[in-house]
Amino acid sequence: MRKSCLGAILLFSMICHGVHAERLQPGSPLSGYQCYNIDAEALKLTPEDAWDGKGFPPVFRGPSEDSGKLGVASGVVYVAWPLQKQNGFVQILRLGGDVGWISGSVIRPLYREPGSKGGCTLSWNGNLIQFHLDPGAKAWLFRDGHNIPEDKYLAHSLHPE
């Protein structure tokens, strides 16, 4: 009985792994998620903070701070779509494919050009998720689109003053 149960579990996990691997082939699109930004205003971030990644919100294992911290969010977060809200948290997909939870008060939809339905398209590229912005979508942390502090831009510019 134990051997047949163990065999069934092993077979089931191999089938599930095969389905999972097939679904996540490099370059394949990921559905069920949408791009949001962290809310720089709610987090009181300066452009310098955003450039350096200071003050970005934590990501948790579950929909509570007590569930354990997985890490810190990036500027663009991939939210489960439609939004999966629980206890003030929103479920997200992290860059490496892990599921996490972030406070719903520190994220917001992407900026969009007037009349645009722009969002994003996600794809799995081996071991990372990549996003491509749809026409009209802006991955800006600040309304004016000037995310790069002037001193950082000039230091990295190919065109000297």
Label the predicted regions.
Residues 4-14:
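Sec-dependent N-terminal signal peptides
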Residues 16-21:
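Sec/Tat signal peptide C-region and signal peptidase I cleavage site
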Residues 22-47, 93-161:
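Boundary regions of SH3-family modules and the immediately adjacent low-complexity/disordered segments
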Residues 54, 58-64:
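Core beta-strand residues in small-molecule sensory/regulatory alpha/beta domains
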Residues 54-56, 85-89:
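Extracytoplasmic
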Residues 62-75:
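SH3/SH3-like (including bacterial SH3b) beta-barrel domains
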Residues 78-83:
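Beta-strand cores of secreted/periplasmic/IMS beta-sandwich domains, seen most often
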